[in-house]
Amino acid sequence: MITLDVIKSDGSSKTCTHLKKIIKDHSGKVLIALKLILALLTFFTITITINYIKVENNLQICQSKTESDKEDSPSNTTSVTTKTTLDHDITQYFKRLIQRYTDSVINKDTCWKISRNQCTNITTYKFLCFKPEDSKINSCDRLTDLCRNKSKSAAEAYHTVECHCIYTIEWKCYHHSID
């Protein structure tokens, strides 16, 4: 060993023997400690890199979906589809939601706009829009236009959940039937 040769030729035999013993006794432990530190640093570096790549991929997915929606939409708004049928549970949910946030009961045709967050699978109920009492509108499309244009004769109630990457918007309608 080069180190031992240097020590041997450098000093007295007593000092040399003592230093040889220290190096021999502790060199293995020091190397093991250095290897463990290197392994831990490698593990943390790989973990941080993997998490960074996941976040970057999610961000790119959100951005690409947002950009594709902007390209598909002529007026830089998200695409809108109108649905006229609802199952009973969803209708009941919206009736309760409207009642809670507006202190009113659905007794007329109603439309609401639903935004879906595809990145984290969150559904956001942007706002509810009610047909005016005196209106003769019977079509969901016409009612949707009225709500979308925020006519002064339509009342709005907002219920929003914070989320990111929203790119799908649907309108749903409930037609109140008079029994």
Swiss-Prot record:
<comment type="similarity">
    <text>Belongs to the metapneumovirus small hydrophobic protein family.</text>
</comment>
<feature type="transmembrane region" description="Helical; Signal-anchor for type II membrane protein">
    <location>
        <begin position="30"/>
        <end position="50"/>
    </location>
</feature>
<keyword id="KW-0597">Phosphoprotein</keyword>
<keyword id="KW-1043">Host membrane</keyword>
<keyword id="KW-0472">Membrane</keyword>
<dbReference type="GO" id="GO:0055036">
    <property type="term" value="C:virion membrane"/>
</dbReference>
<keyword id="KW-0813">Transport</keyword>
<dbReference type="GO" id="GO:1902600">
    <property type="term" value="P:proton transmembrane transport"/>
</dbReference>
<keyword id="KW-0375">Hydrogen ion transport</keyword>
<keyword id="KW-0812">Transmembrane</keyword>
<feature type="glycosylation site" description="N-linked (GlcNAc...) asparagine; by host">
    <location>
        <position position="121"/>
    </location>
</feature>
<keyword id="KW-0325">Glycoprotein</keyword>
<comment type="subunit">
    <text>Homooligomer. Interacts with glycoprotein G.</text>
</comment>
<feature type="topological domain" description="Intravirion">
    <location>
        <begin position="1"/>
        <end position="29"/>
    </location>
</feature>
<dbReference type="GO" id="GO:0016020">
    <property type="term" value="C:membrane"/>
</dbReference>
<keyword id="KW-1133">Transmembrane helix</keyword>
<feature type="glycosylation site" description="N-linked (GlcNAc...) asparagine; by host">
    <location>
        <position position="76"/>
    </location>
</feature>
<dbReference type="GO" id="GO:0020002">
    <property type="term" value="C:host cell plasma membrane"/>
</dbReference>
<comment type="function">
    <text>Viroporin that forms a ion channel probably displaying low ion selectivity. Plays a role in counteracting host innate immunity by inhibiting TLR7/MyD88/TRAF6 signaling and STAT1 phosphorylation, leading to down-regulation of type-I IFN.</text>
</comment>
<keyword id="KW-0735">Signal-anchor</keyword>
<feature type="glycosylation site" description="N-linked (GlcNAc...) asparagine; by host">
    <location>
        <position position="149"/>
    </location>
</feature>
<feature type="topological domain" description="Virion surface">
    <location>
        <begin position="51"/>
        <end position="179"/>
    </location>
</feature>
<keyword id="KW-1032">Host cell membrane</keyword>
<keyword id="KW-0946">Virion</keyword>
<keyword id="KW-0406">Ion transport</keyword>
<protein>
    <recommendedName>
        <fullName>Small hydrophobic protein</fullName>
    </recommendedName>
</protein>
